[in-house]
C-alpha cells in the first residue's frame, strides 16, 4: 500500500484489509453451505457480535468534515508568513527603513503595527469568510457557536504574524527569511497533527510541534468542533498563541537596530 502520503496510505490499507477479511470468509461460507446450514446460521457463526458505531458530529464519516477546516488554515498560515515577512522586508529591500521609522517617530512597535494592521484586517476577514463558507454554506457540523471559531481564527492570524515578525527579526534579510518561513510553514503543516497523530510521533518531534501556532490552532479547533469541552482543555494552547506575540515584542529592538544599521540592504 502507498505510504508516501499517510492519509492516502491509511485509506488504501483500510480498504485492502476489508477486502481480505471478506475473501477469507468465503471458504468457510462455501463449506457451511455444503453442509446444509442456512444463511442465518452461517451469519451467526461468522459474526456472533455485530458492532454498531455512531460517530459524533460526523455520522457519515465524511472526510471533508475532518479535513476541510484544518487544511484551509494549514495552507493559509504559509500565506500569512510569506506576506508578513515581505511586507516588513520590503522596507529594507527598497531602502525605505529610515523613512518608515521616522513616520513612526522611531517607535518600532508603532511601525510594525501600522505596517501589518491592514494585512491583519484582510486576513481576519478571509478567515471569518472561510468559516462562513465551511460551516454556513457547506454545513459542516460543529459543537460550538460560530463566534468562538472566528475568535480562534483571529487569534491564530495574529499569532502567525507575530511568528513571522520574530523570524524576520532573527534573519532581517528578505532573501534569507523567505526561505526560512517557507520551511517553517511546511513543518507546521506536517506537525499540526491533521494527517498523522502528533502523540504517535517520536518524542522530540512531538514536543517540537508546539513551536508552531498552527498546531495550537488545530487543537483548539478540534475541541470546539467535536465537543466544545471548555476553556480548561485549551487554555495552554490559547496561552501559547499569546506567547508568540511576546516573542515578537522581545525582538523588536533587534529589528530596529538591523534596520538602522543598513547592513542587510545589499543581501540579495
PLM features per residue range, with description:
Residues 1-83:
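Transport-system extracytoplasmic interface segments
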Residues 23-32, 131-136, 158:
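Hydrophobic, membrane-facing alpha-helical anchors
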Residues 27, 31, 80, 96, ...:
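Short amphipathic alpha-helical interaction/hinge segments
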Residues 43, 56-60, 100-113, 138, ...:
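Juxtamembrane loop-helix boundary motifs flanking transmembrane segments in multi-pass membrane proteins
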Residues 54-134:
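Hydrophobic alpha-helical transmembrane segments of multi-pass membrane transport proteins
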Residues 121, 129-133, 141-268:
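Membrane-spanning alpha-helical segments of multipass transporters and channels
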Amino acid at each position: 500500500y502507498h505510504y508516501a502520503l499517510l492519509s492516502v496510505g491509511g485509506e488504501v490499507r483500510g480498504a485492502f484489509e476489508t477486502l481480505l477479511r471478506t475473501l477469507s470468509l468465503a471458504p468457510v461460507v462455501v463449506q457451511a453451505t455444503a453442509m446444509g446450514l442456512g444463511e442465518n446460521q452461517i451469519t451467526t457463526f461468522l459474526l456472533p457480535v455485530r458492532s454498531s458505531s455512531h460517530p459524533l458530529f460526523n455520522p457519515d464519516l465524511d472526510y471533508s468534515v475532518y479535513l476541510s477546516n484544518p487544511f484551509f488554515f494549514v495552507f493559509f498560515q504559509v500565506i500569512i508568513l510569506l506576506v508578513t515577512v515581505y511586507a516588513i522586508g520590503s522596507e529594507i529591500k527598497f531602502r525605505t527603513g529610515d523613512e518608515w521609522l521616522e513616520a513612526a517617530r522611531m517607535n518600532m512597535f508603532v511601525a510594525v503595527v501600522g505596517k501589518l494592521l491592514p494585512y491583519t484586517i484582510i486576513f481576519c476577514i478571509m478567515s471569518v469568510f472561510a468559516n462562513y463558507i465551511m460551516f454556513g454554506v457547506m454545513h459542516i457540523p460543529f459543537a460550538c457557536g460560530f463566534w468562538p471559531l472566528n475568535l480562534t481564527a483571529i487569534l491564530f492570524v495574529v499569532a502567525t504574524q507575530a511568528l513571522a515578525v520574530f523570524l524576520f527579526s532573527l534573519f532581517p534579510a528578505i532573501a534569507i527569511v523567505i526561505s526560512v518561513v517557507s520551511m517553517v510553514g511546511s513543518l507546521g503543516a506536517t506537525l499540526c497533527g491533521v494527517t498523522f497523530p502528533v502523540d504517535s510521533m517520536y518524542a522530540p518531534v512531538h514536543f517540537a510541534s508546539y513551536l508552531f501556532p498552527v498546531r495550537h490552532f488545530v487543537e483548539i479547533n478540534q475541541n470546539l468542533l467535536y465537543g466544545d469541552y471548555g476553556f480548561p482543555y485549551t487554555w495552554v494552547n490559547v496561552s501559547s498563541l499569546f506567547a508568540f506575540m511576546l516573542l515578537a515584542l522581545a525582538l523588536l529592538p533587534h529589528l530596529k537596530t538591523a534596520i538602522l544599521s543598513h547592513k542587510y540592504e545589499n543581501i540579495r
